[in-house]
């Protein structure tokens, strides 16, 4: 996600850096050093946007530690501001959510093997041109990377409004021995059971309101 530059963001992030994850690019992040409750599972959202999804998950699931990953500094600032406001409104302290303002093509450079319990991919860039297919976050090499950093039998959830990207993702998963498809739908909002625990992203709300179908799949690591 890209937003216009907001002059207040840099100073705001510096002031609230305890909610940010620093990475020296030389060593992997030690997840046990990030949160007060070190024994809680860790869920990672890759491309967290303005923070609605991960903020509401963190509010709802205090027994889980969350990481929101986003490479655009302005977006991280907007997301963190939303998080702090939502928690403050409920008189809660943010203890189970941190933001990571960085990115690496190979997440194995950042996270140790089998260190993440669950991964969320929400409305990722579809990279519609065929020559850019390797940049799609559900391309086979990315699926292999996720399988490396996620724990045994860990879960990955993926939502998108882009039907072409969804079809592509299903094909990639079908050919990848590391993952088993356990749920899929091309119309999430017609699945009443699935909606019970659904937390929408900003894009999701926008597209659904406009009448666009929302695709979702869930895969499980096979080992």
From Swiss-Prot:
It comes from the Bacteria. Its EC number is 2.1.1.33. One of its GO terms (cellular component) is tRNA methyltransferase complex. InterPro entries: SAM-dependent_MTases_sf, tRNA_(Gua-N-7)_MeTrfase_Trmb, tRNA_methyltr_TrmB_bact. GO terms for molecular function: tRNA (guanine(46)-N7)-methyltransferase activity. Pfam families: Methyltransf_4. S-adenosyl-L-methionine binds at residues 45, 70, 125. Catalyzes the formation of N(7)-methylguanine at position 46 (m7G46) in tRNA. PANTHER family: 3-DEOXY-D-MANNO-OCTULOSONIC-ACID TRANSFERASE/TRNA GUANINE-N 7 - -METHYLTRANSFERASE, PENTACOTRIPEPTIDE-REPEAT REGION OF PRORP DOMAIN-CONTAINING PROTEIN. This is tRNA (guanine-N(7)-)-methyltransferase. The gene is trmB.
């Amino acid at each position: 996600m890209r937003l216009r530059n907001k002059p207040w963001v840099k100073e705001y992030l510096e002031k609230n850096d305890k909610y940010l994850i620093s990475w020296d690019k030389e060593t992997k992040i030690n997840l046990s050093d990030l949160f007060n409750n070190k024994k809680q599972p860790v869920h990672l959202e890759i491309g967290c946007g303005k923070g609605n999804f991960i903020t509401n998950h963190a509010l709802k699931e205090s027994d889980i530690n969350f990481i929101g990953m986003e490479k655009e500094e302005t977006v991280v600032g907007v997301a963190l501001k939303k998080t702090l406001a939502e928690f403050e409104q409920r008189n809660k302290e943010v203890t189970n959510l941190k933001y990571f303002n960085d990115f690496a093509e190979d997440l194995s450079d950042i996270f140790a093997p089998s260190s993440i319990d669950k991964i969320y991919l929400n409305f990722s860039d579809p990279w519609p041109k065929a020559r850019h297919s390797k940049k799609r976050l559900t391309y086979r090499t990315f699926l292999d990377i996720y399988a490396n950093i996620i724990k045994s039998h860990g879960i990955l959830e993926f939502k998108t409004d882009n039907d072409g990207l969804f079809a592509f993702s299903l094909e990639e998963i079908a050919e990848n021995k590391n993952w088993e498809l356990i749920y899929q739908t091309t119309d999430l909002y017609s699945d009443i059971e699935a909606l019970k625990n659904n937390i929408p992203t900003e894009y999701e709300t926008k597209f659904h309101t406009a009448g666009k179908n929302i695709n979702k799949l869930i895969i499980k690591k096979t080992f």
